[in-house]
Amino acid sequence: MEIAQFKSIKQNFVRELKAANAGKKTSLPFIVHKLSSAPIVEDGEDFEALVIGGSIFKRAICKKTIDKISIIKKERELPLTFKTEKEFLEFIDGELSKDVNILSLNFAYPIKPVFENGKLDGILLAVTKEGGFDGLVGKKVGKEIEGYIFRKRKKKISVSIANDTICLLLSGLTRYRWSELAAGIVGTGLNLAIFLDKEGLVNLESASFDKFPQSKEGKIIDQQSVKPGRALFEKETAGAYLYKHFSL
């Protein structure tokens, strides 16, 4: 691909970004989040953080103090995939510590943010990265986890969930001002996030960007994928598909 073509793709992306910010429908979902006005974790309280990536899992027990969050215990990292909602909920139940009441979920899939009872939940909008989650699309992920844990353990927990790119963007606030930050993840999938202002963030769901010429290999990969016609930019750039370009 020539440099001029890369520049053209960049210009198209910027146009899509500006149009989405103006409220127009574009290939970028442009999912806006607002920061919660109050934390759900008390000072001195332990909570559990789970990272559900496109192909990996991470777990940590953390403690919140007045001025920082400390990792008390960081555990294994392993590959994972979920075909159904049941598999996902059973996995969460198996990994959730019995000693915590709050679960923070870093979730690598497109979710629509929903504030409920003072905490951030998310409705799973679709499945990317050739994932499954059958039965979970269209549901509030945090609420489903809370209900499942209560049925299994007779214990009430609070779950807060955000897209992984939003989590990455927020982590930058520990070192930089919001106006200096943007976040990008190029792993199993592809996504970007930006700040609109001090309290507003946007998950672009960049995988859906389609204002570019597909490669010959990309067209074949798309046709053979679980969701043809969707996440076209991701299918040209991300780890779940990139190796296939060299096999065709």
Feature locations, PLM:
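Short glycine-rich phosphate-binding loop at a beta-alpha junction
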Residues: 47-50, 99-108, 159-160
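Short amphipathic alpha-helices and their capping/turn segments at secondary-structure boundaries
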Residues: 46, 85-101
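Gly/Thr-rich phosphate-binding beta-strand-loop-beta motif of the actin/hexokinase/Hsp70
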Residues: 33-72, 113-114, 178-198
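N-terminal charged helix/coil linker that caps or initiates catalytic domains
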Residues: 1-48
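Residue-level signal for inorganic ion chemistry
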Residues: 59, 105, 246
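Glycine-rich phosphate-binding loop and adjoining helix at the ATP-binding site
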Residues: 72-90, 111-176, 180-182, 200-208, ...
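Low-complexity, highly charged intrinsically disordered N-terminal segments
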Residues: 1-10, 104-106, 119, 127
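Active-site core segments that coordinate phosphate-bearing ligands/cofactors
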Residues: 37-39, 169-171, 175-184, 190-248
